[in-house]
């Protein structure tokens, strides 16, 4: 539904911190499904870990937050160019169930739980081959910058 060029319109992140490769489903105000292709060519694997490459859990959480940001921006019909930004405001109930390794395609499924006074709450999961990798409740703050 959104390729990388479209995603870049809704996220201010750029290489090497843009964690979403494609959005495959988006229902404004409700949910998003996006994915990231994990490659051995990513710089993070030079140090995490050279002889046992594992994609860091904290970057899985960041990818979830970025998917939430795309959903929020699309729902509110805003972009970073308008001076809007979604800031990572909090996280609850994080669980890591399996490792993510080079060659995996990680799907992120995020659903809006609430949106009040610029604070959005999302229930999120990450999956590889249909198997649960990570789950969390993420909060984002919709703010104006500049």
From Swiss-Prot:
The active site is at residue 48. The keyword Lyase applies. Its main location: cytoplasm. It is an enzyme of class 4 (lyase). One of its GO terms (molecular function) is (3R)-hydroxyacyl-[acyl-carrier-protein] dehydratase activity. Belongs to the thioester dehydratase family. FabZ subfamily. Involved in unsaturated fatty acids biosynthesis. Catalyzes the dehydration of short chain beta-hydroxyacyl-ACPs and long chain saturated and unsaturated beta-hydroxyacyl-ACPs. This is 3-hydroxyacyl-[acyl-carrier-protein] dehydratase FabZ. The gene is fabZ.
């Amino acid at each position: 539904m959104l390729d990388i060029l479209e995603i870049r319109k809704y996220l201010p992140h750029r290489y090497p911190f843009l964690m979403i490769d494609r959005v495959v489903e988006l229902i404004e105000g409700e949910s998003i499904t996006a994915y990231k292709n994990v490659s051995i060519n990513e710089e993070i694997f030079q140090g995490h870990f050279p002889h046992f490459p594992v994609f860091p859990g904290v970057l899985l959480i960041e990818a979830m937050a970025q998917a939430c940001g795309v959903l929020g921006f699309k729902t509110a019909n805003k972009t970073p160019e308008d001076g809007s930004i979604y800031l990572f405001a909090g996280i609850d109930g994080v669980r890591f169930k399996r490792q993510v390794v080079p060659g995996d395609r990680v799907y992120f499924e995020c659903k809006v739980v609430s949106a009040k006074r610029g604070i959005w709450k999302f229930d999120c999961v990450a999956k590889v081959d249909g198997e649960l990798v990570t789950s969390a409740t993420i909060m984002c703050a919709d703010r104006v910058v500049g």
